[in-house]
Amino acid sequence: TVMPTSAPKDCPLCFPERENVLWHDASCRVIRIDDPDYPGYCRLIWNEHVAEMSDLSPAEQRHCFNILMAVEVALRECFSPDKINLASFGNVVPHLHWHLIPRYLDDRHFPQPVWGAAQRKGGSSPAPRVDDARLALAVRNAIAEHIAG
């Protein structure tokens, strides 16, 4: 990913050390987060170093939202969660990105946010095991269908 020269040298999303990229285009990428409690946890990262959705043009906003919705569809298809959490904070890393997290009624933190206090002991996640290749294919297919119409 080529970042503009205005990107801060310490931005971990502009200059990632290692990412498990499931899909990408010139504007953004979808990565899978390695979290044993939340194996379907993905992140949608805008490639350009901007902080807010409103920093994007209307066309870029639509593209970002279309990708976000397509990834949600893929996560629902692959993981059959009770809920999908979508979050965009940027308080710690002020680079536009979205968290997409399949949630289950009996996951470690439910009904609290995954960053909140655990509600039960960790252990095996209630999520089905889905390998990277299957999830990447589901993401690509959902994006193609969502963008097509």
Describe the role of every protein-language-model region.
Residues 2-149:
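HIT superfamily nucleotide-processing domains
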